[in-house]
């Protein structure tokens, strides 16, 4: 193989994988081409966290099969094959590799430098999903807009601190693809961070399935990671994404101290809460109470007013009543989050939630999404 083409429909974590694959192929003297029809190898990085993203990914795979040369090979990377294994029958002519199986490329390309020897990238390029189909790409952009794709900014330095997570959320199928937590050694992260500063970067983002659970598998914690990073001198800001609520509860006193000391070096923190109904949180298998979350977030807001905190809210989870939904709306209003990432519940194959009774009708889910967006717009108007 001499040339490759790479397209991505993935989240920020899979975007890191895509860049690492590109670095790996270049290291093995396989060169990127902008012309799909000239590529010997076409890699499509997919997403299937939601049905809409699965459909978009499948459309992409079909399109690249149609566009490729007859002798070219298509490899489907990302989460699609593990989240919905049935698609492997639908696309029997392509090879599937999950985020934990990327080293399977070694045999496919007869690699001289194995994938495991390629370091995580810190600067992430853009790999459009449909370069020659702008109307389809626009659809993909709409689907991905809420992901806050800050990692595509040229001035942002990405620090992947871990893969996988420790959660078992009943609605999540991504874990089928990414597996258990695997944290990067602290010294390696600090070394990467310092290298970014040495190169003149001022904006950094921590990437992981759950930043809050960092280090549990290697005997340290996210608190120790943050302390180590903020101990480094320099002019910089760090985005702390996906610091799940249970870890805010667990590490609250230490986090409050860190936030007070270093809030000027924090761009923003994302604390996914998902629901403000304890009943729904239990069904979701989210291991915290909304009372604890409210208590600690309100203390952070009162004592560190300069720290920006955003959240994730899922609406329409099976069994969610209007009263449950109102609890989430009131939570958003009371805290006045400057940004809320809204997820409409979507059945995913083989998840516990997909087997639950009490599915919320789609029109009700759509109305609830609209209601959250309306509240969010009102909050932003007041804050600005």
Question: Residue locations for each model-derived region?
Answer:
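Hydrophobic alpha-helical scaffolding
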Residues: 179-182, 241, 286, 318, ...
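Conserved SAM/AdoMet-binding glycine-rich loop
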Residues: 74-78, 83, 198-322, 334
């Amino acid at each position: 193989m001499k040339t490759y083409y790479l397209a991505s429909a993935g989240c920020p974590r899979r975007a890191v994988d895509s860049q690492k694959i590109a670095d790996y192929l270049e290291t093995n003297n396989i060169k990127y081409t902008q012309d799909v029809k000239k590529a010997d190898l076409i890699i499509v990085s997919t997403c299937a966290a939601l049905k809409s993203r699965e459909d978009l990914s499948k459309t992409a795979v079909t399109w690249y099969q149609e566009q490729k040369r007859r002798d070219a090979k298509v490899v489907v990377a990302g989460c699609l094959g593990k989240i919905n294994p049935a698609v492997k029958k639908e696309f029997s002519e392509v090879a599937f590799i999950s985020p934990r199986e990327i080293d399977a490329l070694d045999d496919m390309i007869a690699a001289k430098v194995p994938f495991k020897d390629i370091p995580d990238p810190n600067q992430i390029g853009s790999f459009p999903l449909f370069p020659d189909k702008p109307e389809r790409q626009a659809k993909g952009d709409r689907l991905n807009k809420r992901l806050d794709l800050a990692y595509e900014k040229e001035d942002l330095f990405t620090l992947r601190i871990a893969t996988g997570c420790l959660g078992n959320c009943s609605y999540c199928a991504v874990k089928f693809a990414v597996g258990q937590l695997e944290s990067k050694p602290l010294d390696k992260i600090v070394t990467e961070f310092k290298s970014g500063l040495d190169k003149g970067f001022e904006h950094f983002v921590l990437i992981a399935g759950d930043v809050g659970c960092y280090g549990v598998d290697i005997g340290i914690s996210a608190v120790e990671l943050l302390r180590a990073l903020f101990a480094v001198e320099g002019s910089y800001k760090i985005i702390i994404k996906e610091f799940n609520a249970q870890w805010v509860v667990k590490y609250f006193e230490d986090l409050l101290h860190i936030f007070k000391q270093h809030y000027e070096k924090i761009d923003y923190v994302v604390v996914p809460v998902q629901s403000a109904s304890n009943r729904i949180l239990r069904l979701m298998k989210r291991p915290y109470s909304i009372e604890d979350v409210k208590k600690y977030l309100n203390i952070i807001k009162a004592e560190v007013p300069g720290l920006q905190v955003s959240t994730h809210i899922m609406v329409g989870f099976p069994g969610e009543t209007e009263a449950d939904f109102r609890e989430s709306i009131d939570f958003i209003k009371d805290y006045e989050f400057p940004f809320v990432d809204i997820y409409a519940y979507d059945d995913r194959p083989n998840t516990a939630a997909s087997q639950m009774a009490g599915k919320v009708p789609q029109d009700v889910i759509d109305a609830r999404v609209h209601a959250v967006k309306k509240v969010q717009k009102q909050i932003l108007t007041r804050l600005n």
